[in-house]
Regions:
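Short, glycine/charged-rich "phosphate-handling" switch motifs in NTP-dependent
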Residues: 100
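Charged docking surfaces used in two-component/phosphorelay signaling
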Residues: 16-24
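Receiver (REC) domain active-site loop signature in two-component systems and cognate sites
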Residues: 56
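C-terminal output helix
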Residues: 107-117
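Active-site beta3 strand of CheY-like receiver
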Residues: 46-51
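Active-site residues of response regulator receiver
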Residues: 53, 83
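Short hydrophobic/Thr-rich beta-strand motif most characteristic of the beta2 strand and flanking loop
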Residues: 26-33, 41
Length: 122
């Protein structure tokens, strides 16, 4: 079964780069441009993994993670934060909100795909 991944980032070019990498590895990709937009994309979808930026307009990534973890259908869905922030305090804040993994941009595609594969394991 193909796994579906929601990619949330306010940068269209970053969503495109991540999307190409994931699609080439056989994943189905849904995109959201910020946390609020991404929440609307979750309705009626089955998503196996969420990859989210932290700093976004309208709704930031940490607030988005908190909202997702309150949703019955997604409370156990793994979330990876993919961000330019390397601050340990911010990372702890993301983990406390419910993010399972934290990857700093720029990243190597192989690194991203390795993390995705681990997070998508049953």
């Amino acid at each position: 079964m193909t796994k579906t991944i929601l990619v949330v980032d306010d940068s269209a070019s970053m969503r495109q780069v991540i999307g190409i990498a994931l699609k080439s590895a056989g994943y189905t990709v849904i995109e959201g441009r910020d946390g609020k937009d991404a929440l609307s994309k979750l309705a009626g979808q089955k998503v196996h993994l969420i990859i989210s930026d932290v700093n976004m307009p309208v709704m930031d990534g940490i607030s988005f993670v908190k909202e997702v973890k309150q949703m019955q259908n997604y409370k156990f869905t793994p979330i990876m934060m993919l961000t330019t922030e390397s601050d340990d305090a911010r990372k702890r804040e993301g983990q406390a909100a419910g993010a399972r993994a934290w990857m700093v941009k720029p990243f190597k595609v192989e690194q991203l795909l390795g993390a995705v594969q681990k997070l998508c394991m049953p």
